[in-house]
């Protein structure tokens, strides 16, 4: 079975948690796109839901699939967010942001009663850090922000190269919010929660891709089927 087919399996399993009348956060990325497409099929069959997209790309996909959309300005809470992840550890802490939507993804996840992460089994890791950690930053004062981030890595016992993410045109990738992204190649993060706490207050850091304590359930698709992991 292909990796794409496994992603679709995980998305289909998450769809079982969706009930009529729910307010849903719609994630970004290849696996989340499968969920949006499958949700669209259910909507066309009569399911009544409303979604909040986490990126302009997801907004376009949801509109194409006929899913009614709204914003967090019109809703105080969401019932459920379904999103993918770049890495998932045994505590269901995540690295996200490979698709560049980490800021909106975290806002939507934090506004949800429950977050389900869907992925193929290759995203399950013993510890976070092999996937480059995205850090969304304001372009102004970039060198000063980079130095402060590097100091935070040292305090957290992590080290590695930071590079500005580039788009297909070779220029700096620009997020939906107009920011840039550092991708930090750390290899291993000894304590993800500690590092998150060090990054949060840095001036110039808008958000980072460490999602600590937000996911409640992970659905991992593999050759043997779907493995459901709930946060301890």
Swiss-Prot record:
Pathway entry: Carbohydrate degradation; pentose phosphate pathway; D-ribose 5-phosphate from D-ribulose 5-phosphate (non-oxidative stage): step 1/1
Catalytic machinery residues: 105 (proton acceptor)
BP term (GO), one: pentose-phosphate shunt, non-oxidative branch
Coiled-coil regions listed in the entry: none
Gene3D superfamilies tied to this protein: 3.30.70.260, 3.40.50.1360
Listed SUPFAM superfamilies: D-ribose-5-phosphate isomerase (RpiA), lid domain (SSF75445), NagB/RpiA/CoA transferase-like (SSF100950)
CDD domains assigned to the protein according to its UniProt record, in alphabetical order: RPI_A (cd01398)
Family recorded in the similarity comment: Belongs to the ribose 5-phosphate isomerase family.
Subunit structure: Homodimer.
Designated name of the protein: Ribose-5-phosphate isomerase A
Organism (species): Nitrobacter hamburgensis (strain DSM 10229 / NCIMB 13809 / X14)
Source species taxonomy: Bacteria, Pseudomonadati, Pseudomonadota, Alphaproteobacteria, Hyphomicrobiales
């Amino acid at each position: 079975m292909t990796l794409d087919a496994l992603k679709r399996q995980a998305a289909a399993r998450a769809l079982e948690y969706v009930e009529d009348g729910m307010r849903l956060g719609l994630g970004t990325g290849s696996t989340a796109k499968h969920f949006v497409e499958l949700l669209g099929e259910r909507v066309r069959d009569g399911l009544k839901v409303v979604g909040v997209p986490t990126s302009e790309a997801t907004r376009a996909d949801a509109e194409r699939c006929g899913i009614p959309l709204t914003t967090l300005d019109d809703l105080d809470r969401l019932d459920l967010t379904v999103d993918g992840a770049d890495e998932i550890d045994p505590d269901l802490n995540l690295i996200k942001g490979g698709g560049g939507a980490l800021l909106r993804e975290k806002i939507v996840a934090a506004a949800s009663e429950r977050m389900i992460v869907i992925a193929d089994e290759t995203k399950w890791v013993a510890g976070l850090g092999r996937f480059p950690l995205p850090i969304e930053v304001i372009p102004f004062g970039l060198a000063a922000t980079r130095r402060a981030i590097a100091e935070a890595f040292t305090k957290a016992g992590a080290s590695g190269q930071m590079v500005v993410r580039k788009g297909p045109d070779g220029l700096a990738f620009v997020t939906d919010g107009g920011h840039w992204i550092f991708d930090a190649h750390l290899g291993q993060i000894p304590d993800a929660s500690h590092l998150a706490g060090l990054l949060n207050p840095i001036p110039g850091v808008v958000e980072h891709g460490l999602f600590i304590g937000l996911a409640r359930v992970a659905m991992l698709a593999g050759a043997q089927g779907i493995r459901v992991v709930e946060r301890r």
